[in-house]
A protein has these predicted regions:
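Hydrophobic anchor residue at the start of the ABC signature
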Residues: 154
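ABC ATPase nucleotide-binding domain "signature motif"
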Residues: 145-151
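Conserved ABC transporter NBD signature motif
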Residues: 59-69, 76
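Conserved structural motif at the start of ABC-family nucleotide-binding domains
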Residues: 5, 20-22, 137
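Helix-to-loop junction immediately C-terminal to a conserved catalytic motif
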Residues: 51
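ABC-family P-loop ATPase nucleotide-binding domains
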Residues: 85-143
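The feature captures the beta-strand-to-loop junction immediately N-terminal to the Walker
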Residues: 36-38
C-alpha cells in the first residue's frame, strides 16, 4: 500500500526542548489512526505536521508523496482532509457555516473579501446536505453547539474530497 503519511526521524524543538523526539511513523491509505497521549505529549504538534501547518526542526515529513520543505504546501493542503479542536479555534466565530466549509477548497480559514467559484459553493452546499448540516448554512460558527461545530469541521475536511 502507498504511504499517505511518512515521518522519518522527526524532531520538533522549541526553546531547546524537544516537543517531538525522533518520531518514525507511516500511515498507508487503508489505515485509520487515533493519536492519544497526556497533555503536553506532542499530539497537536504531530497533527500540525501532518496538516502542513508546521515543519520539523529535523527529519523529514512526506505527505501524499510530497516532502515538506520541497513542495508548495498551499498546493498540497487542499488534498488533505483535517479536523481538530485546534482548527476550530482558528475559525472566526462570526464565520457562517457555509463559509467555514467553502473556504476549505481554498485552504484558508476565514473569509475576507474573496469571491469564490459557484461550483465550489454548490459543492459546499452538497457536503452540508450530506452531513445533514444544510439547515445551519447561514448560522455563524460561534453560535453552534460543540457537537455541531465538530460536524462542520468534518464537513470542511471532506470538502476537498481528500
Amino acid at each position: 500500500m502507498p504511504q499517505v503519511l511518512e515521518f522519518s526521524d522527526v524532531v520538533v524543538r522549541r526553546n531547546a526542548r524537544d516537543i517531538v523526539s525522533h518520531l518514525d511513523w507511516e500511515v498507508s491509505d487503508d489505515q485509520r489512526w487515533v493519536v492519544l497521549g497526556p497533555n503536553g505529549a506532542g499530539k497537536t504538534t504531530v497533527l500540525q505536521l501532518a496538516d502542513t501547518l508546521l515543519h520539523p526542526t529535523s527529519g523529514s515529513v512526506t505527505i501524499l508523496g510530497e516532502r515538506l520543505g520541497r513542495t508548495d504546501v498551499f498546493e498540497l493542503r487542499p488534498r488533505i482532509g483535517f479536523a481538530s479542536s485546534a482548527m476550530a479555534r482558528r475559525v472566526p466565530p462570526e464565520e457562517t457555516v457555509l463559509d467555514v466549509v467553502l473556504t476549505a477548497a481554498y485552504s484558508v480559514t476565514g473569509r475576507w473579501r474573496e469571491q469564490y467559484d459557484d461550483i465550489d459553493e454548490r459543492r459546499a452546499l452538497r457536503v452540508l446536505a450530506e452531513w445533514r448540516l444544510d439547515h445551519l448554512a447561514d448560522r455563524t460558527f460561534g453560535t453552534l453547539s460543540d457537537g455541531e461545530q465538530k460536524r462542520v469541521q468534518i464537513a470542511r475536511a471532506v470538502m476537498t474530497d481528500p
